[in-house]
Amino acid sequence: MKFFAVLALCIVGAIASPLTADEASLVQSSWKAVSHNEVDILAAVFAAYPDIQAKFPQFAGKDLASIKDTGAFATHATRIVSFLSEVIALSGNESNASAVNSLVSKLGDDHKARGVSAAQFGEFRTALVAYLSNHVSWGDNVAAAWNKALDNTYAIVVPRL
């Protein structure tokens, strides 16, 4: 049993390696190109995964087209994008690691309380990466940087769910 615990810690440690300055720059610059599209980002997530939309009481059971242009939708989309923007802005600087860990840990705790699953976080990731890859200059280097950033984030979030 101890072996598996150590193995799990080694895997998480290997996954959760900080972004280099170059990787952080790729994530930050690509995010900057789309972060003003809050409503479109959240709409893309909901369109791809209606089960995620169903987790939001104010949007559950409603047609996406009927809520996309509402103030409530824009407000929530801005909250999500602002959170991502804050974490992304802190990335690439090792002295910010504890701040990122605190923010992302709270994200996991908050979403556990709402019954969000690791699978739904995976769906969010898939939808976000699909959105990014269709709206920014997306090459292997950008994809690798985003995958590393998301791996790091999910290594903190998923165990808390």
Swiss-Prot record:
Ranges for domain Globin: 18-161
Listed GO CC annotations: extracellular region; hemoglobin complex
Alphabetized PROSITE patterns for the sequence: GLOBIN
SUPFAM superfamilies in the cross-refs: Globin-like
Signal peptide: 1-16
Self-association and partners: Homodimer.
Protein name stated in the entry: Globin CTT-VIIB-3
Species whose genome carries this gene: Chironomus thummi thummi (Midge)
